[in-house]
């Protein structure tokens, strides 16, 4: 039988307050009932459309040659108008290059996490397992699938064509991972998510943390004195 899963004791969360999450999915907070209905409607569409996301579906081959490598370009870097091949890219301070979102994995990453959250909240509110099941599929396809799973590094994040294959500043692309952590904890309430898959996701993030703490790009970003350093923390 389908029933709301908010009666289950929520696990400790990283960003959100579990009691507040419970109040939201129960509809206890005035003015949020329509928002919750919209989230459930979005979850229905996500399940129906069956769209999954992966770094491997990007037409742009990263410098590593491995489609599973996350790739993005710096937001303020543009093709060089003075060279035939556009290289090296030149910086236009404060001018966002829309080409970035056409060649980068960043939009797919954000879309995946947005969908996972919608499905997770809808699952918490209704107990409808297909929501949790498709959220798990999104997570598996992005992180764990043998052919499509992202490698646990950001070697090629915010690359600058013709100058560098990746920078520490690109780590901020994955700041949204913080949002994903709470969704993963909430999905642990689903009986459809196997322990082996849960462990595999944790192993992936252990490897990612190891890269962050030891790779020169990670070390550089950790030492940053601006919003990038804060995002790293």
What residues fall within each predicted segment?
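Extracellular glycan-targeting catalytic surfaces
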Residues: 1-219
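Long, repeat-rich segments with strong aromatic
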Residues: 231-233
């Amino acid at each position: 039988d389908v029933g709301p899963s908010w009666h289950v004791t929520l696990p400790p969360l990283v960003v959100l307050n579990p009691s507040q999450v419970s109040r939201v999915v129960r509809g206890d907070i005035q003015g949020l009932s329509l928002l919750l209905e919209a989230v459930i409607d979005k979850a229905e569409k996500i399940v129906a459309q069956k769209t999954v996301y992966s770094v491997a579906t990007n037409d742009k081959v990263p410098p590593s040659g491995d489609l599973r490598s996350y790739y993005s370009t710096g937001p303020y870097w543009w093709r060089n108008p003075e060279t035939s091949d556009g290289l090296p890219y030149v910086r236009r301070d404060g001018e966002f290059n829309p080409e970035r979102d056409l060649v980068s994995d960043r939009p797919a990453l954000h879309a995946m996490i947005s969908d996972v959250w919608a499905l997770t909240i809808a699952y918490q509110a209704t107990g409808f397992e297909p929501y949790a099941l498709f959220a798990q599929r999104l997570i598996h396809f992005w992180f764990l699938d043998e052919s499509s799973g992202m490698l646990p590094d950001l070697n090629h994040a915010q690359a600058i064509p013709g100058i560098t294959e990746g920078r520490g500043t690109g780590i901020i692309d994955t700041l949204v991972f913080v949002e994903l952590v709470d969704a993963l904890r909430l999905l642990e309430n689903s009986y459809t998510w196997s322990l082996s898959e849960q462990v595999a996701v944790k192993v992936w993030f252990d490897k990612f943390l190891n890269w962050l703490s030891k790779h020169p790009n990670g070390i550089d970003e950790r030492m940053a004195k601006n919003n990038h350093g804060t995002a790293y923390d």
